[in-house]
Amino acid sequence: MERVIQGNDAREQANGERWDGGSGGTTSGFKLPDESPSWTEWRIHNDETDSNKDNPLGFKESWGFGKVVFKRYLRYDRTETSLHRVLGSWTGDSVNYAASRFLGVNQIGCTYSIRFRGVSVTISGGSRTLQHICEMAIRSKQELLQLAPVEVESNVSRGRPEGAEAFKEESE
């Protein structure tokens, strides 16, 4: 029988674990490790004059179960391969497994949060709605990452709306 971990004990255990299984041979069910950029990478890719600008190398996400919060940074370069990799980094089953270690018999709050390029999405509810939170989190993560703007110069970005040439030819 596993004991319910509360307060400081829970935080200490969470700090000792990473989403990839962490120290001491524990397994949390999450497949990818934290991929936070080094201080040098962070300085190169951030505008120091704008402290609100996110690092363009990836995104931050977290799962919270009561007072225990698992955070990580994943690299994401907006390619199809990268999208499939980060979307497959956890499933509802792996979240349920990780949560079951901290939820115990009492209903506590569960929260998923993701921040990418200045947009932050947070989904929360009670532990009895965890499966629904997982489904919403997967959908939100996929939509947020797929809707990332592609930096391509177009007629619109140069001040000329698309079809301007066609309109000019027809009027002549």
Swiss-Prot record:
Keywords: Host-virus interaction, Inhibition of host innate immune response by virus, RNA-binding, Suppressor of RNA silencing, Viral immunoevasion. GO terms for cellular component: virion component. Residues 1-20 have a biased composition (Basic and acidic residues). One of its GO terms (biological process) is symbiont-mediated suppression of host innate immune response. One of its GO terms (molecular function) is RNA binding. Residues 1-37 are annotated as: Disordered. Gene3D superfamilies: RNA silencing suppressor P19 (3.30.390.180). It comes from the Viruses. Pfam families: Tombus_P19. Viral suppressor of RNA silencing which binds specifically to silencing RNAs (siRNAs). Acts as a molecular caliper to specifically select siRNAs based on the length of the duplex region of the RNA. Belongs to the tombusvirus protein p19 family. Homodimer. This is RNA silencing suppressor p19.
